[in-house]
Amino acid sequence: MKCSGPSVVPRARSYVVVGACVLVLLTGQGCRESSKPAAGITITLIHQLWSDKGSQQRMNETLKTFTARSGIRVEVLPAPEPAVEQLATWRSLLAGRASVPDVYGIDVIWPEILADEFVDLRTYIPEREIAAHFPELIASYSVKGKLVALPYTMAVGALFYRVDLLRQYGYREPPKNWEELEAMAARIQKGERARGHADFWGYVWPGAPSEALTCNALEWQASESGGTVIENGTVTVDNPHSVRAWERAARWLGSISPPGVVAYKEWDSLNLWQAGQAAFMRSWSFGYVIVRAAGSPTRDRLQVAPLPEGRRGVAATFAATGYGVSRHSRHPREAAMLVGFLSSRDEQRRNCLITGMPPTIPDLYSDPEVVAEYPYLSTHLQVYRKSLISRPSTATGKLYPAVSRAYFEAVHSVLTRKTSAAQAAAALQRNLMQITALKAPASATGAP
C-alpha cells in the first residue's frame, strides 16, 4: 500500500555505490594517506544516519568543526538504507580487510557479530568519557570486555498520538493498555471517517517482514509475559502469552490498522501519520522530530507516551547507534579521535538541540535548554528506565540475524493469515532450537 501525504523517506543507497566509493579510496587517495603527517590524514566514515540530504548538510558542518580542531579530514561514504543491507555491506567490507572505511556506524545489535573486526576503543578513549554514557549502552557495545563502539544516539519504542483528536472525542489521556488503545482507535477512526476522512486509520505501525517487526512483536509479547524469545539459555517463544499477543495484532488488520500495514516499513507508517491519516502510531522516540517537521499537518497536534501495557506491564525495545574503528584502518588513533568527538557530551548536546535525536549521556536529559526544546525526551527517559527490553542479540551472538529473520517471518505469517499463531509459535520454537542448538525450558519439554 502506497502512503499518501508528504514523503519523508530518505533515498536508499546501493551496494554498487558503496563498493565504487571504497574502490576509489583504496586505489587513490586512501592508499597515499599512510605517508602523510597526522594533520593531513583523511578518515573515511560510513553510516546510514547520514544518507539523506538534510542529515548530510548538518553533519558536514559537524565534520568541518572536527577538521578545524584536529586537522584531520573526514569523507563520508553512502550506505544502503535497510539495516539488513547495511550489516551485509559492513561484513563484506570487513571480510575483504579494506582499510577504508576507518569508522563504521554500529547498530546496538551488531557488536557480537562484528567484534573481531574492530579495535578496543578503551585503548584510545579515556575512561571518564566512556563512563559518561548510559552504562547499559556501554555494556551492549562491549564484548568480553572489549568496547566495540561508543554510542552516539538512541531511541525507545513509543506511542505517538493525536492530542487534538483525543480531546475531540472526550479522552483526557492516551491509552494505558492494549484494550484501551483498540477501543480509542476504533472510536476515533469511525468518527473521522464519518466526517469524510475515508482513508483515516486508528493505529499504524511497521509490519513488513524486517527488524522493525521483530521489535514490534517483542514488545507485544513481552508486555503479555511472553518473554523475549531466548531467556536463560533456552528458547522460550512457544508459550500462550506470545500466541495471544500475536493473535491480537492480527485482528488489528483491516480493523484499526490498514491491511497494507504488513508491507509497511518504518518510514511508511511515519508518512501516513505525518499526512494526518492516523490517530496512533508506534515509532521510535526520535520520530517525534521527524513528524514535527516544518509543513507537517501534525506538527502541533502530537504527543508521545509509553506503549500500552499488557499483563506484565509496558515493554519497549530500544535502538542505538554507535561508532567503531575498523581493525584494518591505517589510522586507528585518528579514527578514534573522530569517534570520541562525535560521541562527546558537547557534540551530543549540539546534535540533540538541532535534530532532537535522544542523547546517550544521562545528564543531558536534565539540561534546561534540551528539556525546553524537546519535552518528549522525558517520556523517552521514563521508558528507558522502567520498561526496556532487549532483543536477543547478545544471547545469540553471530546467529542473531538468522534468529531475527526466523522470528519476524513467523510473526508475519500470522499477520498475513498464512498460519495460526499457535502453529507459528510451535514451528518457530523448533526452528530456533535448530539454529541456536539451544533447548526449550524443562517445563516445556515435559521434564520434571
Residue ranges and their predicted role:
Residues 43-61, 81, 395-398:
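Extracytoplasmic "Venus flytrap"
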Residues 184-186, 232-263, 307:
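Glycine-centered hinge/linker elements that transmit conformational signals in sensory
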Residues 107-158, 198-199, 213-214, 299-305, ...:
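Hinge/lid segment of periplasmic solute-binding proteins
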Residues 122-133, 193, 201-202, 206-210, ...:
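Short, solvent-exposed loop/beta-turn-alpha elements that line the ligand-binding surface or hinge
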Residues 39-52, 72-77, 102-103, 148:
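Short, well-ordered beta-strand elements
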Residues 140-141, 300-305, 353-406, 413, ...:
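Long, aromatic- and glycine/proline-rich binding clefts that accommodate carbohydrate-like moieties
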